[in-house]
Amino acid sequence: MVGAIRTESSVSWVYIRTNLTLPCGREGEKGKSNMNRNIHRAGQKGGNDSMSDIHHGAFLTEEIGSSFTKGKEARRTFMKKLALSGAALMPASYALADKGGKKPHSDSISEGDADILRFLAAAEILETDLWQQYTDFVDVPSPYTAALENIDGDMPPYIDQNTNDEFSHQNFLNAFLVKMNKQPVSLEAFRTLPSSPVSPVQTPRLTNLMHMNVDTSWFLRYRSSGNPDFGDTFGQAVNIVNRPSIPVQNQALYTGDQIQAIANTAAFHFAMIEQGGSSLYDALSLKCSSLLALRIVTSIEGSEVAHFEIWNDKAGDAPAVDSGDGLVFPDLNLNPATQTNQVMPKPCKFISEDLPLCSVIRPTSIELAGAVAAATFLASTGLFLGQSDSFFKALFKLAAAADKAVRECDHGGHD
């Protein structure tokens, strides 16, 4: 997607789903065996599959009544059996927990998992950079801050909190990669873009918020039963093309409507970024080989979803305004498809059209929500305007590696 041409097929990001298939590393089942096969094996003698321990556990439950009526020795014997059964059902990594009660970790992770976490670290670094620019403005009283507070009085602290969360994500992911003896990510060589001329903090940036093409199709998507993964497309709730989401001149030179339009643009941009992160994390989680990587990806995803829901609600509070120079924010409640109080994800098509509609994140396919799709989408919004060719090569190299990651159990291996 290029410039302001934004269709749902290239808007690659958005919301949260429980993964039904577990990764198959040391902590998971090897191969492609399904649950029915496992249950069948559980009843066979001598099976060493983890599911076979369920058979032993069922045997122990039959002893509960009699064991507690046969005195102390019987109870001790029963408790020993119960402990052994529990240990058998427990993932091996938990049995290796240190004496301080801390849960252990594997010595390392697969290269595919590392590629996934590296791209997510890069995405978080970029997110942190853009959120920091918003924080720099709202931490100072100004007409822009007042316009954001006109949307919701808590906008400044919400922005600060979101910024802090992104810092925590980037720092954790890179620290974890180092802990796993994997290469971390640094984009500092590309911190070359200028701040807004009127930013309270003048420092080189990675992202550009001064010429934004803000996708607002998510506002319709989550209020519809359609799903991009099934080919459904959506228009724009508001047409925001080549507009700043932060002030770019002395704020006294803006009219009241103009500064409100800039604040409204920011509000929709907040949600656009976070719905995208939600879809990205969900899509890449399905490629994780280890339970450890899966835990990290889905846990951070939950934070992204929480962010999106806040900003989805706040964007709906953006007042109708005409900037006077071509940007119009309509009264969204005049359109049944954009009712502002419909903030919960409407049930939509999911997995198969012959199944009931389900409230989920969408899209979640690699084609529409994977790393390359996410990088392509962000580039189309103007977020990287002014960046070097080397930046784009580095970003898309990381993205391609993440998308190529394969759950190792899908090929009969393990991490």
What residues fall within each predicted segment?
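N-terminal export signals
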Residues: 77-98
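Compositionally biased, low-complexity segments
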Residues: 5-8, 29
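All-alpha RGS (Regulator of G-protein Signaling) helical domain and cognate RGS-like helical scaffolds
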Residues: 39-43, 49-73, 83-84, 98-415
